[in-house]
């Protein structure tokens, strides 16, 4: 793994896992297979090693979830962002496309090799896993009661984005611990789902102190 700005210019993936485990209060041994898959191989990371380790430690339990996505290009863009920030993604089926779709791969490029993806056959299957993790479900919706900038995010939140064509059904609304919206001009429907994901995840990262800074600041 190549790390831009590190003292040596190189940072072995096993060392990265050790740093991450220590940052999370775990043992100093190598990390599990999921993280190894997420960061495996050589990869350019645009941050000093110490800042990336802090970022990864804080974001290790924060997740994005996509509810029955319709458009492969949006999903590919979100997966690329998640790879860059080290955020796992839950994809809740059925999806409107195959995960090997050419359009998805075109949007995600080679970043698919660097993101942890968990696929769930249904919302019920996803909920069983989420509840076992003990993570809050934070729904991003045009029907949200609170602006995302006014919400206090937690490090283990799961940020859920609805289907492009229909959002999420009432069952999913009821399951959410919080329903957030992005303030917009009146008369306009909604933002692109990938843009919305970037805006809200960026705020969540800022709140929990995981925003990377340049060495000069």
Segments (PLM) and residue ranges:
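Polybasic, low-complexity intrinsically disordered segments
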Residues: 1-2, 17-24
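Intrinsically disordered, low-complexity segments enriched in small polar residues
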Residues: 5-9
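Cysteine-centered motifs
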Residues: 15-17, 31
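Post-transcriptional modification and biogenesis factors for structured RNAs
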Residues: 22, 26-29, 34, 42-217
């Amino acid at each position: 793994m190549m790390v831009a700005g590190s003292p040596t210019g190189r940072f072995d993936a096993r060392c990265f896992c050790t740093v991450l485990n220590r940052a999370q209060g775990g043992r100093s041994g190598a990390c599990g297979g999921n993280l190894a898959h997420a960061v495996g191989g050589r990869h350019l990371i645009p941050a000093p090693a110490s800042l990336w380790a802090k970022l990864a430690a804080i974001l290790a339990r924060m997740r994005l979830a996509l509810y029955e996505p319709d458009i492969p290009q949006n999903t590919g863009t979100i997966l690329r962002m998640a790879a860059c920030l080290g955020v796992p993604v839950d994809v809740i089926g059925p999806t409107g496309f195959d995960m090997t779709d050419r359009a998805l791969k075109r949007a995600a490029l080679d970043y698919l090799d660097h993101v942890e993806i968990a696929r769930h056959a249904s919302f019920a299957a996803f909920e069983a896993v989420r509840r076992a993790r003990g993570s809050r479900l934070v729904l991003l919706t045009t029907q949200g009661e609170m602006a995302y900038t006014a919400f206090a995010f937690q490090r283990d939140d799961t940020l859920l984005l609805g289907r492009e064509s229909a959002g999420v059904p009432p069952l999913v609304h009821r399951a959410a611990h919080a329903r957030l919206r992005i303030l917009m001009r009146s008369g306009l429907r909604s933002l692109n789902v990938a843009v919305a994901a970037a805006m809200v995840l960026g705020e969540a990262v800022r709140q929990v102190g995981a925003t990377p800074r340049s060495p000069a600041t």
